[in-house]
Amino acid sequence: MTREILETMRNTSFDIPYVYYMDHTDGMIVPCSIRVTDKTLIIGKGLMKWQDKLYIMTQPVTIGYYPTEEWRVLKIRFLPQTESKDFTLFDTDIFLDEDIQIKDDEMEIGRFKLKAGSRLRQNYVDFHDLNTEFDTLNVILTPFAGIGSPTISPQITRHFAREAYPHTIGMPFDNGFICTCMNSERPVSRELITCYVKARLALKKNYFTGDELYAHLSHILADIKKGIAVDGYNRRSRDRKIFVE
């Protein structure tokens, strides 16, 4: 093959994912894998979008960590582009930061508080464990690329769906949302989650932050486990009634 053909194939192969995600907002597309050792975090491959560009993490990055019992945020910083004769380089820097604010050129991967003598973990027992304060990697505020606006981690919606599903007999409104969460390969859109939360809890607000969405889903999950449907009736109590003529 000629050099021109090879360059065309190379450029086209990278254009395919860009076209696929061109209508998405900034945010994670494929979250970086994170392997935890006693003293280091090993950040693996991932794909994200920022300012209309796709960034692919191809090489692992090792970052040291230690207990502080204060929030530490694992961030990606998008560096200014650099020019050379043959190409333009868009590079990133991954680091731990004690500043919990996310600057305009940064994106959050996750955050944690670590106690002395403890080890950071990312295997969640249940939905509520996603928000455990200490010794647990928290991804509730990690933005995921979506249509119209960034959305929340699919770990949140999948944990919600798995726990809620066994309790939703006779709750078709909840079943529809839960099946979407369980079957979707991509993160669930923020618009759908917001519409579900607003209808389920009779809320008027049109926008919720990531931690607000998590809190509302937690409230809904508690109601579902009690048998309380969207119309306010307790399905369990109603099903147990015996009518005698």
What are these regions (language model features)?
Residues I42, M48-E245:
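Beta-strand-rich solenoidal segments
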Residues M1-M48, L54:
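N-terminal "first-domain core" detector
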